[in-house]
Amino acid sequence: MDDAVGDLKQALPCVAESPAVHVEVLQRSGSTAKKEDIKQSVYRLLKRHNIVFGDYVWTEFDEPFLTRNVQSVSIVDTELKAKDPQPIDLSACTIALHIFQLNEEGPSSENLDEETENIIAASHWVLPAAEFHGLWDSLVYDVEVKSHLLDYVMTTLLFSDKNVDSNLITWNRVVLLHGPPGTGKTSLCKALAQKLTIRLSSRYRYGQLIEINSHSLFSKWFSESGKLVTKMFQKIQDLIDDKEALVFVLIDEVESLTAARNACRAGAEPSDAIRVVNAVLTQIDQIKRHSNVVILTTSNITEKIDVAFVDRADIKQYIGPPSAAAIFKIYLSCLEELMKCQIIYPRQQLLTLRELEMIGFIENNVSKLSLLLSEISRKSEGLSGRVLRKLPFLAHALYIQAPSVTIEGFLQALSLAVDKQFEEKKKLSAHV
């Protein structure tokens, strides 16, 4: 128990003078090296690079042992709360090493037989999953959403391990992310599950992520739906019983399950729908008592969620469309990737928004392209994160169609793709 509490203390934000720095070590899938040997080699690597600037990744190593056994060493999450990257003196920090290997099997389906039908009720991943690698870093938000969610879950686990009386201080291990479609709510839930599995790898051997298909749990015979919910949660309970696993239950578009109560009151749904709502709430109440489970939920239509469900959520976080500043970061990461793959060639240095601020947004040879990207970001406001990540592909497909392009040519194409996106939205709205 003391070791578990110690792991959690290390993973929580450090209040002491010596700040905690999290270092994620991705061990190669074929490697059988002992974690202790990898740990010592990584410590030597960090000693050789005493000062780093913000988040930093090593993929090439001087030591042959690291080259054979480690894919990457990453200093992570130093920029979640700081507005800008800061220099970090590793010798003055408490290093929290998290060594992990990715599961490459992909998702499996959890089926529930309902008479002659075979209902896919959930998708199931063993974490950390290769499918979600890099997802956390790709999600850009204006406020400290990611750090708040990390801190929340770490605190719930610490309170459980310290045996805090839940009758005196209540926490439910339920997170609700709400906001318009396409803002990355589901992706954030999956990325959070992956991040926590890695961060607590010394405490739990692996993670389990169950994404419940809330639409499938509604049988066309409402009287059967309550039974399906119970069946589904019985399978989840089996996973929770393994105390070496950290279990995440993701219920996407939770309003489709919980809106039934209000519809029933209005006479629009059969009374059996109430049983489904009650079954969901009862099952959540049962599994949330376990210290190794976190329930993650999303909703596109907040006002349609059952009040009894909303009350159970400890954190109700709104996830809105990205601001111009967040859009700039998203586009910048896309351009970096295209330059790395030499679709944009030759490579050119782009300034960050902070660097543009420092020079007063004055246009010169160094800042010209970055200012153009800033302008494109401003006119992209109103588009969802999902659409923004597609736009570089659409820009190339619609306006370039060549193996490589200069960054000037690509930015022109990106600007046209943004204009086209708003035109299409306008046409769709006119026909709705």
From Swiss-Prot:
Gene3D superfamilies xref list: P-loop containing nucleotide triphosphate hydrolases
Q: Which GO terms describe its cellular component?
A: chromosome; male germ cell nucleus; nucleus
Per UniProt, what is one GO molecular function of this protein? Answer: ATP binding
- In the record, N-acetylmethionine modifications are located at M1
Name listed for the protein in its UniProt record: Pachytene checkpoint protein 2 homolog
Chain residues that bind ATP? G179, P180, P181, G182, T183, G184, K185, T186
User: What are the UniProt keywords, alphabetically?
Assistant: Acetylation, ATP-binding, Differentiation, Meiosis, Nucleotide-binding, Oogenesis, Spermatogenesis
Q: Name one GO biological process term.
A: reciprocal meiotic recombination
State the similarity comment.
Belongs to the AAA ATPase family. PCH2 subfamily.
Protein's UniProt keywords contain 4Fe-4S: no
Name the domain of life: Eukaryota
Described purpose of this protein according to its UniProt entry: Plays a key role in chromosome recombination and chromosome structure development during meiosis. Required at early steps in meiotic recombination that leads to non-crossovers pathways. Also needed for efficient completion of homologous synapsis by influencing crossover distribution along the chromosomes affecting both crossovers and non-crossovers pathways. Also required for development of higher-order chromosome structures and is needed for synaptonemal-complex formation. In males, required for efficient synapsis of the sex chromosomes and for sex body formation.
InterPro entries assigned to the protein according to its UniProt record, in alphabetical order = AAA+_ATPase, ATPase_AAA_core, ATPase_AAA_CS, ClpA/B, P-loop_NTPase, Pch2-like
Q: Do you know which Pfam families this protein is assigned to?
A: AAA (PF00004), AAA_lid_TRIP13_C (PF23242), TRIP13_N (PF23563)
Subunit relationships = Specifically interacts with the ligand binding domain of the thyroid receptor (TR). This interaction does not require the presence of thyroid hormone for its interaction. Interacts with proteasome subunit PSMA8; to participate in meiosis progression during spermatogenesis.
